UniProtKB/Swiss-Prot annotation:
Membrane topology field: Single-pass type I membrane protein
Name assigned to this protein: Disintegrin and metalloproteinase domain-containing protein unc-71
Result of altering L471P: In ay46; sex myoblast migration defects
Gene Ontology cellular component annotations, sorted alphabetically: membrane; plasma membrane
Length: 1042
């Protein structure tokens, strides 16, 4: 009865509409019409006659084929008008979907005869558009055999359109059924059960896939670029049986569903779907259909990997008519796009309403990309339901659930983060461009290529062979790798990608691969800035946003300013509509995410081209200033800004953080805290430890750390798990290191540098010391000229000191005093030698005529020199001036006297000045008294001038020698004691014990036994042996003799 009443009503409507034109056609008896009408409610549809408007408002039929060009080519742009009693006049502005499939798309059918190519040409008659250009409406339909598709509005009201059999499709009066669409059965998504498994699987594939692409497709904002998902459509045997094994009907159903899903994804996510392969099973079921949809999905993955592996695709989609447990109608592997596990299974829930399958397909593609189900906090105003809902179909409560074609703001925010992470670079190429890319020499590394430096003529990579696109034998990596230097892998720890913001982290090479690790950042919600938090690797801080707009003194305005956003005015709103340019008023809970209001700062914006508003009002006797920018691009509060506890702003809405940011499981030893509560977690599941903590899970106390918190980072309280590999390493954030703790490598470098500095200082000191130690005192010029290279030094008979040693042992006290005298004597000798060297250019002067005295052709270097310490023999000689000589001038010598200049007898009374004899050891008991005598004589020296005084001096020397060796040991002891009392230790203080009688020196002792009566002119006198050995005197004596 119900069916009969429906058919009767349908017949009445059709007859009233068509009149006598179609009165002869009994559309109630058509099998297709009867099957469709059985699914309609009596009051939920109406018959309409759509028509097409072409140029110059010409009204034609609904056939969109362009017969002027090709019979099977449809117009790119069409406009369909539908007059409805309920909706009024609907003007559908449509554009052909040129990406749904291409000429290269292969349509295959598998039957008992094997695999065959479907010969019938598939027409592209699939359109997308809006109602009257209103962006808040949704239209997707096909026009191959009448109009068949969906028309939806922003409030969730959805209508389906279906063509009736009969009549002329080229006429303007072809009947269609316009009906209100709602879900008629329970339907759930099965992907939630596979979420955890799929996510773990995806993490293993992300880095492997990116290692081939992310170095060339560098991280960049691709949210505005169109992405293309190439899919392989498979219709299993159960699905084909439900459609009577009609090839074109099955293909049309799948393409209509794909067209609707493509329209949803392209509007909000800028993703296009394209069928690159279509396969129909018309003989047997090639995979097992289990009640467990997850197990069935595994069979789809195995089939796609084993049978259609040669098809270059991003995902495989199976349409089936099988039934699964728990009313599950779809399933997909979470975040598996561009991998071998990228597969979707969709049940054909409605035979005539393809838009329900289109919604399921769009949701499944979202799961492949990484989108999760929306929570109750996510909305897509004004539509009550969003695409990523967990339960698409619900029955009860006065009707079914509405059709959803909008993605929530949570899903849009998640997808934007996925694009920023750069994990889906495979979607940037257009369909069928893979064959062009996957060839050696195009400069892009793809497939099994190890490198690709372009053509042989243009290759600049010394590590890559341009002919085979493989590494050269000596190379470990290629030049395009971030962790490669001169064809060798960079050592572990080298930074290959620096941080770009306070919420970003620097990646380091691992020393095993030339690829830089995946780009990661601190997880969303990490505190940063003045009052901000991390969002997609950047710090979202309203204070900093105000400072960028109004200057450094600007701050966020009072909360009352944000309440103005509910007005939807130009200066206070939650966004601008693209269709008519009007502004969205904010909901009360979203006011903080609308127009950003600031106060203070400059009067006008820093960017003078921006249109700004400033208004003041008083509240509770308090003056409040609100400054805003009338530009949605820069005037709205930035995404990721904290708007409430655990909530963030996304596209003008305040949503829960957990609904827009995927949870990341970082290693920890406390399940309640990420990174053990001592660090921050990154999107790559690694920990950045606080100062004083280290280890994979930041659970080890240490004196140093790779992180010192800046930017006001606080500890997170969200949970996490520790089910991560021990291979994870604590990484470093260089720009956040503002403390005093240094790295071990830094300390080692400082220590090494300090050691090198000390070594250089030591070398410099050694060089300076060596230079100073080799300085030689130059000899006087006259000594250099007079010295003969053949000169020999003769020492003669050296005295024996054995007796002296014996005496030293017997009386150490005496010899101790003598040693002190010896040291003083050596110092005086050194001083005398220096004076002699300095006066080497002086000459002996004859007092009689002032002429210099030359002895043996050599000028005496000591003639006329002032005597610093005169010997006792010379002092006594001056007392006996009556002694005559044989006419020779006595010359001062050390150890002997000689004369070479004749002196006349008349001059015997003259005096010879500045002449000294060698020192002779004297009795020491009268040293003090003799010292006073020498001092008085030094002040008024008296020269002797005759030979007699000269000979007398000789006698004195002999007598002094006799006195020295003739005295007893007691006298020597008393002399030493006297010397000790006086305190003198110089040669000038060595005097005689008492004055001696000059008459006792009549017979001087001559050298070599010569008698005193000898008349020889050259006298060589032997000086008495001294108690002290003076090598300087010995050297000078020999030089004088020679």
């Amino acid at each position: 009865m119900i069916c009969a009443s429906k058919i009767t009503m349908l017949g009445l409507l059709v007859m009233c509409t068509l009149g006598g034109v179609l009165g002869k056609v009994d559309i109630r008896q058509t099998t297709a019409n009867k099957a469709f009408m059985e699914t309609m409610r009596a009051d939920g549809y109406e018959v309409v006659h759509p028509f097409q408007i072409r140029d110059k408002n010409e009204r034609i039929g609904i056939d969109t084929r362009n017969y002027f060009l090709k019979a099977q080519e449809h117009y790119s742009h069409v406009t369909i008008v539908i007059r409805s009693n309920q909706l009024g006049r609907l003007k559908l502005v449509l554009e052909r979907n040129n990406f749904i499939f291409l000429n290269q798309t292969a349509f295959h059918k598998l039957d008992a005869d094997g695999e065959r190519v479907i010969q019938n040409r598939v027409e592209n008659c699939y359109y997308q558009g809006t109602v009257g250009g209103e962006e808040s409406s949704f239209v997707a339909l096909s026009s191959c055999n009448g109009l068949r598709g969906v028309i939806s509005f922003a409030n969730g009201t959805t209508f389906g359109i279906w063509p009736l059999d009969g009549g002329d499709r080229n006429s303007r009066r072809h009947p269609h059924i316009l009906y209100k669409s709602e879900w008629s059965q329970e339907a759930k998504c099965g992907s939630s059960m596979a979420h955890a498994v799929g996510q773990r699987r995806m993490k293993k594939h992300v880095h492997k896939h990116r290692s081939h692409h992310h170095e060339h497709n560098k991280k960049r904002d691709v949210s505005k670029r169109t992405k293309y998902v190439e899919v392989a459509l498979i219709a299993d045997y159960e699905f084909m049986k439900a459609r009577g094994l009609h090839d074109l009907d099955a293909i049309s159903y799948m393409l209509e569903s794909l067209n609707i899903a493509d329209s949803m994804l392209s509007r909000d996510l800028n993703i296009r779907l394209s069928a690159v392969y279509v396969e129909l099973w018309t003989d047997v079921q090639r995979i097992d259909l289990w009640e467990d949809i997850e197990r069935t999905l595994s069979g789809v993955v195995d089939y796609a990997s084993g049978h259609i592996y040669h098809i270059q695709k991003d995902a495989s989609i199976l349409f089936t008519a099988g039934s699964f447990a728990n009313q599950e109608v779809s399933n997909a592997a979470i975040r598996s796009i561009c991998t071998a596990r990228s597969a979707v299974i969709v049940k054909g829930v409605e035979q005539f309403a393809t838009h329900w399958n289109g919604e399921l397909l769009a949701q499944s593609i979202g799961h492949l990309l990484g989108l999760e189900h929306d929570t109750t906090a996510c909305s897509c105003e004004p539509s009550p339901e969003c695409v990523m809902r967990q339960q698409p179909g619900r029955v009860g409560g006065g009707g079914g659930s509405p059709f959803s074609w909008q993605f929530s703001k949570c899903s849009v925010a998640r997808m934007h983060g996925i694009w920023q992470d750069g994990n889906i670079q495979c979607l940037l190429n257009k369909p069928f461009q893979v064959s062009e890319l996957r060839e050696c020499g195009n400069g892009v590394v793809d497939g099994s290529e190890e490198c690709d430096c372009g053509s042989r003529e243009n290759c600049q990579d010394p590590c890559c062979d341009p002919l085979t696109c493989t590494l050269r034998p000596h190379a470990q990596c290629a030049a395009h790798h971030k962790c490669c230097h001169r064809c060798e892998l960079r050592k572990a720890g080298d930074t290959c990608r620096s941080s770009k913001s306070p919420c970003d982290v620097a990646e380091q090479c691992d020393g095993k691969s030339g690829d830089c690790p995946p780009d990661g950042h601190l997880i969303d919600g990490t505190v940063c800035g003045t009052d901000g938090q991390c969002w997609r690797g950047n710090c979202s801080d309203s204070h900093q946003q105000c400072q960028k707009l109004w200057g450094r003194e600007a701050r966020v305005a009072e909360p009352v300013c944000f309440e103005q956003n509910t007005k939807g005015a130009e200066y206070a709103n939650c966004g601008q509509r693209q269709a008519d340019g009007t502004y969205h008023p904010c909901q009360i809970e979203d006011t903080r995410c609308g127009t950003l209001h600031c106060h203070s700062g400059s009067i006008t914006p820093i960017d003078s081209s921006l249109k700004a508003f400033t208004f003041h009002f008083t509240e509770n006797s308090h003056q409040i200033q609100c400054k805003s920018i009338a530009s949605a691009a820069v005037g709205l509060t930035s995404d990721g800004t904290n708007c409430a506890s655990g909530r963030v702003c996304v596209a003008g809405s305040c949503v829960e953080m957990s609904s827009v940011s995927s949870a990341t499981a970082c290693p920890t030893n406390n399940l309640a805290l990420l990174c053990s509560g001592h660090g921050h977690c990154t999107t790559t599941a690694r920990c950045v430890c606080f100062n004083g903590w280290s280890g994979v899970a930041c659970d080890i106390r240490s004196n140093s750390s790779t992180y010192q918190g800046s930017m006001g980072f606080g500890e997170e309280g969200s949970g996490g798990s520790s089910q991560k590999s021990s291979e994870r390493k604590t990484i470093m954030i260089p720009h956040l290191n503002i403390g005093t703790t240094l790295e071990t490598a830094t300390l080692f470098a400082i220590l090494l540098g300090f050691g090198v500095f000390l070594l250089l200082c030591l070398v410099c000191l050694m060089l300076c010391y060596r230079r100073r130690s080799v300085v030689e005192i130059p000899k006087p010029s006259d000594e250099k000229d007079e010295e003969s290279p053949d000169r020999q030094i003769k020492f003669g008979n050296m005295p024996s000191y054995r007796e002296e040693k014996r005496k030293r042992k017997s009386n150490k006290k005496i010899y101790g005093a003598l040693n002190r005298i010896t040291e003083a004597d050596e110092r005086d000798s050194t001083s005398l030698r220096s004076r002699d060297s300095a006066g080497g250019s002086q000459q002996l002067v004859d007092r009689r005529n002032g002429a210099p005295v030359v002895v043996g052709g050599i000028r005496d270097p000591y003639a006329g020199e002032h005597i610093y310490a005169e010997s006792s023999s010379n002092h006594l000689t001056r007392q006996f001036r009556g002694i005559n000589s044989d006419g020779s001038y006595p010359l001062r010598s050390f150890g002997s006297w000689r004369s070479s200049a004749p002196i006349s007898p008349a001059s015997s009374s003259g005096q010879l000045t500045d002449v000294s004899t060698a020192t002779t050891p004297l009795r020491l008991n009268k040293i003090g008294k003799f010292l006073k005598t020498l001092q008085s004589d030094d002040e008024s020296p008296s020269p002797f001038s005759d030979h007699q005084s000269f000979t007398t001096g000789i006698g004195i020397g002999a007598r002094l020698e006799q006195m020295q060796f003739g005295g007893g040991g007691d006298e020597e002891l008393s002399a030493v004691e006297a010397d000790h009392d006086v305190g003198s230790n110089t040669e000038s203080s060595r005097g005689c014990e008492e004055p001696m009688d000059p008459g006792s020196w009549d017979s001087p002792t001559l050298v070599n036994g010569a008698s005193s009566s000898s008349t020889s002119n050259n006298y060589n006198f032997r000086q008495s042996p001294s108690l002290f050995s003076d090598p300087f005197k010995l050297e000078m004596t020999n030089s004088m003799h020679n």
